[in-house]
């Protein structure tokens, strides 16, 4: 009942926004810039930390995108989670006496999620002074856990990069690839071969890695895996993506869950965000179908591995998506922008330690708590 009530609060909040979103888009306010000051009250843990963590990030996905999926695809896999909360995503970018920002990008929010630290837009796991900050993937490696990154974008894109690299600007994907090649991450799967020249692949392989370009390639269980299945990001779902997020997640878990010390894997459904930037309901619908399949796979896995914590959230919302009735019973999906918004995003969790996320929180609280679990 509590989970249902929390969902109702989320939906009610979004309904109010949807009704007045178009008008608000055009209204110029004179609010004095301030950063929010909230005493976040995350619960204490149940006393049992998870052995392993599956951290799913659906890029650019707010309540509007889930509403599109619910009505257009007839699916809402997150309803299977035990706990649900709400997340603020603003970056630390600018002085609030003059020009602070409420709208994050995937680099700043990725760093908040990976390291529990606020930073400026564009920063990849560095603080506002451009000093590296330690990520949960690096903490997991230090604690002897197997580690993995999966994305439907380039693997060097902002969100996955924020877990395994440190650069001052997100567009330095070639440099991020160079860092990944020597980072000893056990599994890296996604797109972006163009940032991995043969010389860099050789460096990776000489350090005990196996490069694959076909998801069906037999992998050596004694080697780390780098799978790059497209030159750039993977193909859109509605255009016939050949390698699904769930296929990559399955391959990752088959190789990570052999580690007796547990594993950490971040899996990004990257392109819901791109559908928001494109103002394409069809794009969003396809990527949300992929997300639903991924969530079902992860929760099915967790049901037979009860020591695994599964967390699903977003780095930010994109497009200011709202759903209305269209003609002849179809959906009228409206956008208030072609960029990110400051709208809160949901978080869901199931498994040991999941109940702490049944709250309103800043995105840094997610990173901090998951790092605490890894350190225990």
Task: Say what each PLM segment does.
Residues 2-10:
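Sec-dependent signal peptide recognition
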Residues 10-18:
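Hydrophobic h-region of N-terminal signal peptides that target proteins for export
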Residues 20-195, 200-218, 223, 317-376:
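N-terminal catalytic scaffold of extracellular/periplasmic and nuclease hydrolases
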Residues 55, 189, 227-229, 264-268, ...:
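Structural motif
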Residues 63, 291-328:
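Metal-dependent active-site segment of extracytoplasmic phospho-/sulfohydrolases and closely related
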Residues 113-121, 226-238, 273-279, 348:
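Gly-rich Lys/Arg/Thr-decorated short loops/hinges at beta-loop-alpha junctions or inter-strand turns
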Residues 158-164, 233-237, 257-297:
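Active-site His/acidic residue clusters
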Residues 214, 218-228, 248-270:
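Active-site regions of oxyanion-processing enzymes, predominantly non-cytosolic
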